[in-house]
Amino acid sequence: LTMAYYDNGNEILTDYGASRFLNIEAKNKGHYTRENESFAKQTIAHNTLVVDETSNFGGDIKVSSRYHSDIIYSDFNGDHFQVMVAKETNAYSGVEMKRTLVYVTTPFLQFPLILDVLQANSDKEHQYDYPLWYNGHFVSLNFPYTKASNGLQTLGTKNGYQHLWL
């Protein structure tokens, strides 16, 4: 249940899982990046939910190829309102995910609104991580912060987390 968002051909939510298809000439005419296995193929590289720091379907493409998400509802006919709802029950054992994406335009706002609601249900407790790879610039915060300049640590040791810094 991933999400991609473009504005006039410009990628706003980057899918780093597509890194093997980017900058083909710079990568010796299509060779994969070194991070292809350790990051790009991992669920954390996509704009979707990660459960217990593991890639969906156990990272096994043969298993994932046997399943697909189910569309629950969609309506793309409105001029100012479009919606898509889908669910996934096979990506993680015992976890059901449902994602609702809504695109809304209104004369009161200069730019459209995108609502992204992702629900996860399970009978067991899990750690949920929800990365959104925004292709933008940090401008300001309304609270003080300290910039990390040394002693950075990785968020984890495998499944792409070794490429993320705290």
What are these regions (language model features)?
Residues 46, 148-166:
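Glycine-rich (often Gly-Gly/Gly-Pro-rich) flexible segments and glycine-rich loop motifs
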Residues 1-151:
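Catalytic and substrate-binding regions of extracellular carbohydrate-active enzymes
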